[in-house]
């Protein structure tokens, strides 16, 4: 396998980076561009930006900051938020983004994945999946419009089935957002990620739960994911990226310089 990726995630709302817990009660973290610049300088392998209310507000991602990001960082970055068409995606890629990610729009129109794949290439197309474990049913269920807690909806899809479906439509990468773990820093959902890995032939990125350096080691070694996405541990300075990468190298995890 290629070297594993460390990916800071920046949730954007009203032009600022915010962070919630289990997709709720978001607090403001800071300005977008300085944070992006900082993470790039610290050695992040790539960045992901989610305009978290774009889909629920029925609008496309606020593009005013995309060009500014492209001007100040030299690592790949992915942008998500309300992208409903090839035209929407094209504008964001033209502004300098390397990838676009779709989540709720893919659930509304799965053929959009194939359209993006055919237009821009599979490497550009990321599908984000917000997965919640329902203790009553014992099943992982896909949710949508999760950026606005008042509008979040459960879908008809069980997570494993949707993972298979998006691959058939041409997804180039999957980010699995484990909602139960989001922001609580108790570790990634290894059980779910391991099960999904068995049916995921494209790069799989784990999201939700990082709290300690060992959590990154565990998710790479036990769930065999290609990358680990995290937010609060980086935003709050709990785990400096250079320190994390040094630790992973000591643990014999293949990591990028």
From Swiss-Prot:
Natural source organism: Pseudoalteromonas atlantica (strain T6c / ATCC BAA-1087)
Protein name: Imidazole glycerol phosphate synthase subunit HisF
Pathway assigned to this chain's UniProt record: Amino-acid biosynthesis; L-histidine biosynthesis; L-histidine from 5-phospho-alpha-D-ribose 1-diphosphate: step 5/9
Assembly behavior: Heterodimer of HisH and HisF.
Reaction(s) the record says it catalyses: 5-[(5-phospho-1-deoxy-D-ribulos-1-ylimino)methylamino]-1-(5-phospho-beta-D-ribosyl)imidazole-4-carboxamide + L-glutamine = D-erythro-1-(imidazol-4-yl)glycerol 3-phosphate + 5-amino-1-(5-phospho-beta-D-ribosyl)imidazole-4-carboxamide + L-glutamate + H(+)
Gene Ontology biological-process entries: L-histidine biosynthetic process
UniProt keyword Isomerase, yes or no: no
UniProt GO molecular function: imidazoleglycerol-phosphate synthase activity; lyase activity
Principal location class: cytoplasm
NCBIfam families registered for this protein in UniProt: hisF
UniProt xrefs under InterPro entries: Aldolase_TIM, His_biosynth, HisF, IGPS_HisA/HisF, RibuloseP-bd_barrel
Subcellular location: Cytoplasm
One Gene Ontology term, aspect cellular component: cytoplasm
Function: IGPS catalyzes the conversion of PRFAR and glutamine to IGP, AICAR and glutamate. The HisF subunit catalyzes the cyclization activity that produces IGP and AICAR from PRFAR using the ammonia provided by the HisH subunit.
